[in-house]
């Protein structure tokens, strides 16, 4: 099946921040694959549309819904795969929509954990990176969440992907 903007799951809905202080109506796209995300981004760029990306919607201050900057939202909830646990190098490869709670369950099966563990079962990797969250007492010993990232693939508005690695 050919993928185009019409084949990507989407809906008009009322979205709310985690603390329910921010609400807005939005067109929400739910890409299931990287190529669907690329199609959405290219369309939005071509048509000069502003948008906001969200994952778990756990931001206390409304950042998870864009605080009325745009009425187009791209939800990463379906881009949530735990791709690999590399035991030799102590590295986990996941997509941005992966929930911290799900990752911790898989890590526990392999006798691993994470240095920075934010509270809340719906917090996603993408949100944790975007907010550079900290876990209770972890920032004193290990730094913030961003300090544990070894590499990051970022898709830009034009659909191109760039890898950023720790120096």
Range-by-range predicted roles:
Residues 18-118, 132, 137:
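Glycine-rich N-terminal segment of FAD-binding domains in flavoprotein oxidoreductases
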Residues 116, 121-122, 128-167:
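FAD-binding subdomain of flavoenzyme oxidoreductases
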Residues 1-13:
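Conserved oxyanion/phosphate-binding beta-strand-loop segments in alpha/beta enzyme cores
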Residues 61-62, 124-126:
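Short secondary-structure boundary/hinge segments and terminal tails
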């Amino acid at each position: 099946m050919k993928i185009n903007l019409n084949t990507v799951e989407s809906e008009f809905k009322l979205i709310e921040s985690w603390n329910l202080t921010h609400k807005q109506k939005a067109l929400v796209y739910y890409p299931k694959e990287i190529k669907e995300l690329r199609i959405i981004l290219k369309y939005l760029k071509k048509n000069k549309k502003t948008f906001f990306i969200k994952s778990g919607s756990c931001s206390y201050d409304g950042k998870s819904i864009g605080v009325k900057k745009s009425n187009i939202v791209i939800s990463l909830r379906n881009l949530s795969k735990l791709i690999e646990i590399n035991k030799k190098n102590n590295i986990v490869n996941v997509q941005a929509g992966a929930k911290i709670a799900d990752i911790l369950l898989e890590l526990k099966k392999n006798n691993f954990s994470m240095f920075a563990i934010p509270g809340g079962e719906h917090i996603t990797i993408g949100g944790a990176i975007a907010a550079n969250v900290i876990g209770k007492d972890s920032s004193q010993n290990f730094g913030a969440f961003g300090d544990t990232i070894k590499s990051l693939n970022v898709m830009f508005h034009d659909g191109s992907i760039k890898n950023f690695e720790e120096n």
